[in-house]
From Swiss-Prot:
Family annotation (Pfam families): Glutaredoxin, Thioredoxin
Location (main, coarse): cytoplasm
Entry GO CC: cytoplasm; cytosol; nucleus
Cell compartments where the protein resides: Cytoplasm; Nucleus
Annotated [2Fe-2S] cluster binding sites: 172
Domain Thioredoxin: 2-106
Record's signal peptide: none
Name assigned to this protein: Monothiol glutaredoxin-4
Single biological process term from Gene Ontology: positive regulation of transcription by RNA polymerase II
Gene: grx4
């Protein structure tokens, strides 16, 4: 069955706990006729698909979440697995949505469920991948050069904020709120506008294993997004982590 998101913390918790799961996001508007039709289709697909999470998100009500996934029109469906966006399906098109489920969800479910796969098969698969790729890969799967660049960026300052826009002109609500929190705490930090470099933007999702922005790093270690940082400020953890 599908789950209706009713508060931001619920969404963040599902993302945090569902890194190994396949998640399909349905951004909709209750007043739009195409969304009403696709909500019914979405609910039916949710009933028919096991071992995947189907989330419905009212785009205008949760504009910050919508902005973090670059939602410009509804209905929009975003398929994610871990930190990777697998597919985006725009508009009222049940056939395309079903095709994406068949292409991405079903194979991944089979892969996750195949606990009896032989070691030999896994080794052969890795060998095949390695022989067909001339690009050096980091352990997280990123291109080695990009991974090294991200490591350098995240260590550029003791505290680094990766956001949409700049601290003076944030380009999304989440970024604006986190900038405000850091200012209230008198935190000195460096920043990087991920809208200016898509390779950094997409790479950080894998590097941090976190699919949304903003992202805060302290001494090169990923701390979290807006909700996690907010909680850490409330319980005093953030101040303890900050360099003297």
């Amino acid at each position: 069955m599908s789950v209706e998101i009713t508060f931001v913390e619920q969404f963040q918790e599902i993302l945090q706990n569902g890194k190994e799961q396949i998640i399909l996001l349905n951004f909709y508007a209750p007043w739009a006729a195409p969304c009403k039709q696709m909500n019914q289709v979405f609910d039916q697909f949710a009933k028919d698909t096991k071992n995947a999470v189907f989330l419905k998100i009212e785009a205008e009500k949760f504009s910050d979440i919508a902005e973090s996934f670059d939602v410009n029109a509804v209905p929009l469906f975003v398929l994610i697995h871990g930190a990777k966006v697998l597919a985006r399906i725009s508009g009222a098109n049940p056939q395309k949505l079903k095709a994406a489920i068949d292409e991405y969800i079903q194979p991944l479910i089979s892969q996750i469920s195949s606990t009896n796969a032989s070691v030999e098969t896994q080794v052969n698969s890795v060998q095949t991948t390695n022989t067909t790729s001339n690009t050096s890969k980091a352990p997280n799967g990123l291109d080695s050069e990009l991974n090294e660049r991200l490591s350098t960026l995240t260590n550029a300052h003791n505290v680094m904020l990766f956001l949409k826009g700049t601290p003076s002109e944030p380009a999304c609500g989440f970024s604006r709120k986190l900038v405000g929190l850091l200012r209230e705490q008198n935190v000195q930090y460096g920043f990087f506008n991920i809208l200016a470099d898509d390779s950094v933007r997409q790479g950080l999702k894998v590097f941090s294993d976190w699919p949304t922005f903003p992202q805060l790093y302290i001494k090169g270690e990923f701390v979290g997004g807006l909700d996690i940082v907010s909680e850490m400020i409330e319980n005093g953890e953030l101040q303890e982590m900050l360099p003297n």
